[in-house]
Amino acid sequence: MKSAPSRPRSPLQSRLALYLDLIRWNRPAGWLLLLWPTLSALWVAAGGFPGWHLLSVFTLGTILMRSAGCCINDVADRDFDRHVKRTAARPVTTGAVSVKEALVLGAVLALLAFALVLTTNAITIGISGAALAITLAYPYAKRYVSMPQAVLGVAFGMGIPMAFAAVLGEVPRLAWLLMLGNLFWVLAYDTEYAMVDRDDDIRLGLKTSAITLGRLDVPVILLCYLAFIVIWDVALMPYVQGALFTIAFALAFGQVAWHYTLIRSRSREGCFKAFRLNHWLGFTLFVGIAGSYALR
């Protein structure tokens, strides 16, 4: 028996599908990498469950700003992306979505995120402005900065001081320590990501940590993972205790060992898989932190 033919998409459905592709809706790993450290900071700042209001603000805000960042990044990189097999089919690169459309969509998403931040307090709103500025600057960093992943690390870590500010009305030293640790994590996983496109980026004259580090890429990635986990462990030890916290950090080290087996040959497939799986490391630490507070 033949199946009924699928109904053709309406113009509106086709446009929506392109916009969802532009913001990587079907690839949640990007916003999950942002979400888990932000939620971890929120739990630590609140000493447990932060309440539904702040949980909603930071979860939705993270997704919206990551989506806005994708729009900005694809506009900035459109002339390079067409020469890279992995990115050549992106909607802005192919012309399926115009530059103007992408910028308008990015602006709308950023404004929605800002509307959420307006429900918090003045210091959180101020930090969000700095976060937006860094987000706008990052796509251009790879043209001028040898380690643009460090710029991304700052951008991806801004949710941490924002979380503390939203809960406490101030940003304590602990927040900056966690942000520093998170910076090393971003350096680790985004260098893995950069290793996927290293040959293309060299040909295009771009700058990435994978190119800058050369054959030191894998050892430095492992050192960055180590710095991330150790900084978070030491910084959080006075605040988060218990067996679940210890188990979570032990599992994090186990995941790093697994990632090493994926990237040691420097194959594109292995490096991309390691990058895509990194959000599980963040999730593991978040569960250890949130679970430890819940079991008190």
From Swiss-Prot:
Pathway annotation from the record: Cofactor biosynthesis; ubiquinone biosynthesis
CDD domains assigned: PT_UbiA_COQ2
Domain of life: Bacteria
Cofactor field: Mg(2+)
Any GO CC annotation of this UniProt entry: plasma membrane
Classification via PROSITE patterns: UBIA
Catalytic activity: all-trans-octaprenyl diphosphate + 4-hydroxybenzoate = 4-hydroxy-3-(all-trans-octaprenyl)benzoate + diphosphate
Keyword Transmembrane helix: yes
Coiled-coil segments on the chain, per record: none
Protein localization: Cell inner membrane
Keywords of the record: Cell inner membrane, Cell membrane, Magnesium, Membrane, Transferase, Transmembrane, Transmembrane helix, Ubiquinone biosynthesis
EC number: 2.5.1.39
GO term, biological process aspect, one: ubiquinone biosynthetic process
Chain ranges passing through the membrane: 29-49, 52-72, 103-123, 151-171, 176-196, 220-240, 243-263, 275-295
PANTHER family: 4-HYDROXYBENZOATE POLYPRENYLTRANSFERASE, MITOCHONDRIAL (PTHR11048:SF28), PRENYLTRANSFERASES (PTHR11048)
Function: Catalyzes the prenylation of para-hydroxybenzoate (PHB) with an all-trans polyprenyl group. Mediates the second step in the final reaction sequence of ubiquinone-8 (UQ-8) biosynthesis, which is the condensation of the polyisoprenoid side chain with PHB, generating the first membrane-bound Q intermediate 3-octaprenyl-4-hydroxybenzoate.
Protein name, entry field: 4-hydroxybenzoate octaprenyltransferase
Native source species: Albidiferax ferrireducens (strain ATCC BAA-621 / DSM 15236 / T118)
